Amino acid sequence: MAIDQIPLRDAAVSLGPEQHGYPVTTPDRPIEVAAWVHTRLGHRQVTGEAVAWTPRAARIRYLDEHGRQGFAWVWASAVQRR
């Protein structure tokens, strides 16, 4: 069964390549995290997985309150391992 994606209007704001930087590390298995994201409704903490990272940021996969999947690059300081 496919997981619905979060519509762009409801998705978290994501950092761009110039902000998150390089090199990008992609683990064999994602790491469980809690992270702060910013959406049009404000800031909120989500649980999810870090699927990639750089020295400055992490790309997280998370589910919103409706069970829809989203991805966002966020600053490393906004992420904690669970």
Residues of each region from the PLM?
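Basic/aromatic-rich interaction segments and small domains that mediate binding to polyanionic partners
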Residues: 2-76
